[in-house]
Regions:
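A short, Lys/Arg-enriched amphipathic alpha-helix followed by its capping loop at the start of a domain
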Residues: 52-62, 90, 289-296
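Metal-dependent polysaccharide deacetylase catalytic core of the NodB/CE4 family, i.e.
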Residues: 35-38, 58-154, 158-173, 196-207
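Boundary/entry segment of secreted carbohydrate-active catalytic domains
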Residues: 27-51
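C-terminal domain-boundary segment and adjacent tail
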Residues: 28-32, 64-68, 72-74, 124-125, ...
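Autoprocessing Asn-cyclization modules and mimics
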Residues: 207-277
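Aromatic/hydrophobic pocket-lining residues that form the small-molecule binding cavity
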Residues: 50, 80, 112, 116, ...
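Secretory targeting signatures
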Residues: 1-28
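Aromatic- and glycine-enriched glycan-recognition loops and surfaces
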Residues: 44-51, 75-86, 284
């Protein structure tokens, strides 16, 4: 009986060795797909991917994805080639987000093909590796997905759903907008972890919105701002007065955290105003969400789209 067991074991061992040398792609020891995942994607190629988000992910040992509309590369408030290259060299994934950011569902198939093929070719011509796509406005249909299959491994849409590993629709990957209170985003993380699914969150430009008063002069778009006494700095985007709300300012956070009662000064215009309150700070919320994931679910993985596909497919 002992000899028979040894013979069976020897035959099995030989079988495995032959398979491993045959080039067979079948995974006889499959990866555990019941791993909860989170992916962060920043759409449009805003410069805040580099000047804000990169430092946040670096500090936590994580990476994210930047979805690039190629017509906007090297334009105001968007990433330049050097920044894109550094992001990818740092482990970020660069996704295509088409050439001109159209609603693909409004285009004939020939134009869809142009948008998807040329954007990939342009990015690759810059020396970047591009395997996956984010649909502008999350819009896609059967025809668009069939075109995407010619050029990409996967495509991300919206739908406000999680992605199950067992029935992954790789050309219609589900995602949630990050434009919600932190508590709601934490709820998405909780659900993904408990159900062992893949949560994809998409973002745009990282901004701070504040209520201001006592404005003197006019701020210049893109100028640097200082906040005293907090010592924070930022980049001015816009401000507008609302009848019921009062005046609101949008800015890109650069350093520090703006505080109520700060005096804001434009470094080029000399304009100034009072900071009454911070309505939302997307930089702070992003940091807190990443720390929530690492603290509460240390075995939950933050991955790029391509890495998530490696795990789930």
């Amino acid at each position: 009986m002992g000899n028979r067991k040894r013979l069976i074991f020897a035959v099995f061992t030989l079988f495995v060795i032959l398979l491993s040398g045959s080039g067979s792609s079948y995974n006889y020891f499959p990866m555990d797909k019941s791993i909860p995942l989170v992916t962060f994607i920043f759409d449009d190629g805003n410069d805040t991917d580099y000047i804000v988000a990169k430092d946040i992910f670096d500090a936590h040992g994580d990476v994210a994805c930047s979805a690039i509309t190629t017509d906007w590369i090297n334009t105001k408030n968007h990433l330049n080639v050097s920044q894109l290259t550094e992001l990818q060299n740092n482990g970020w994934e660069i996704l295509s987000h088409t050439v001109s950011h159209p609603n693909l569902k409004t285009l004939p198939e020939s134009q869809v093909e142009t948008e998807l093929a040329q954007s990939k070719a342009t990015l690759e011509g810059l020396g970047l590796t591009v395997k996956n796509l984010a649909y502008p406005y999350n819009k896609n249909n059967y025809t668009i997905r069939e075109v995407a299959k010619k050029y990409y491994r996967a495509g991300r849409s919206g739908h406000n759903m999680l992605n199950p590993p067992t029935i992954l629709d790789q050309y219609d990957l589900k995602a949630y907008s990050s434009n919600h209170p932190l508590s709601k985003l934490e709820g998405h993380v909780d659900k993904a972890y408990s159900e062992k699914k893949w949560l994809i969150l998409y973002h745009h430009r990282i901004e701070v919105k504040i209520k201001i008063s006592g404005k003197t002069g006019n701020f210049i778009p893109g100028e640097n701002l200082t906040f005293n006494p907090s010592g924070a700095t930022g980049k001015y985007i816009s401000d507008k007065n609302f009848v019921a709300y009062g005046s609101a300012m949008h800015l890109v956070p650069i350093s520090g955290t703006p505080q109520a009662n700060d005096i804001i000064t434009g470094q080029t215009s000399g304009a100034a105003c009072n900071l009454d309150r911070v309505d939302y700070n997307q930089e702070k919320a992003l940091i807190e969400l990443i720390e929530y994931i690492h603290t509460k679910y240390p075995d939950m993985r933050i991955v790029t789209i391509d890495k998530g596909l490696d795990i789930y497919l």
